[in-house]
């Protein structure tokens, strides 16, 4: 029997065993988990946690990531979340951080590493990003809450378009700075 056939049979016999489990978060969450869901209007704090999957913030939900927290996947708030605040001194995001339609102040503070991209699109809440390493692109498009970008390292591009007001800041290093990010 080949390995593929063995895995197929195992998957058929134990369908839930190979799938990541979702943990609902409303309050403080520590320890190891697969995917984490922040339900509508819930306030979740990940503190010294290790996630094998991603974090999903639902409409009106709020997420704070503190301490030595590692998220293997993405942090996604694209359904009108309240905010995402990453305040730990050693937070690692293995994928992307995506925020869309958030309406409160969002912040990513020094000591944070985002291996993928930071995408901040059509938000009415302000964004503060200071002393962050981003392994791919930083993209800010069509935001109305303002953004301050200070002393960040972006491996690829800083792209800022159609933000009112335009982002402010200085000391950022990027492969290429485009449009409203050019002077930052």
Residue ranges, per PLM feature:
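Solvent-exposed adhesion/ligand-recognition segments of exported proteins
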Residues: 27-28, 183
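Sec-dependent N-terminal signal peptides
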Residues: 5-14
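N-terminal signal peptide c-region/cleavage motif recognized by signal peptidases
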Residues: 15-20
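Sequence-structural signature of mature extracellular/luminal beta-sheet repeat domains
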Residues: 21-23, 74-77, 156-160, 184
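Short, low-complexity, Pro/Ser/Thr/Gly-rich segments in the mature regions of secreted, periplasmic
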Residues: 170-184
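N-terminal secretory signal peptides that target proteins for export/translocation
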Residues: 1-3
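The right-handed parallel beta-helix/beta-solenoid scaffold, focusing on the short coil/turn
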Residues: 27, 34-36, 42, 47, ...
